[in-house]
Amino acid sequence: IAGAGVYYGNLSKELDQEGCIHSLDTNLAGVLHAFEIARDIMLPKKQGHLVAISSIAGLLEYRDASVYSKSKRAVNYLCEAYREALRGTGIYVTNILPGYIATQRLYDVNGETMRKKPFLLSEEEAVNISMQAITEKRERIIFPRRMKIAVSILSKFPKSVINFLFLLTEKRKA
């Protein structure tokens, strides 16, 4: 299970080069390296299961999305590529895309505003949903369901509208 992730700033334009490289190294290259090592072990055995923890944040494409969101979007594409390349080998690929999970890290980053995060799940709920998806060898699981629906609706809007809505949200937080 490749599940590392780091987050800097809210918008991509707030990142510096060092933060951007660190985000991409951890969020994307970390999954790639883990998948490569695991795949090389699993291929001779003709069985195995690669799992990536991505994020629902990677589903929306808009200009000012954070590098975290964009790197998780790349993880989603990486999982699709591995799934296709490994089809018929006995190796499964599951991509887990959670929304907000009530972790200590989320609290450290957001403090009291954490309670305002939409559809916040407990760690236990997230683990149970993830484990079920892994056990069932699902290709992809997006949760919580209400956030999945909200993102599905938002993704129908033009990127400029999505960007505007997120900028409004950021201004309200300030």
Language-model segment annotations:
Residues D40, E84-A85:
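Alpha-helical segment proximal to the catalytic Tyr-Lys
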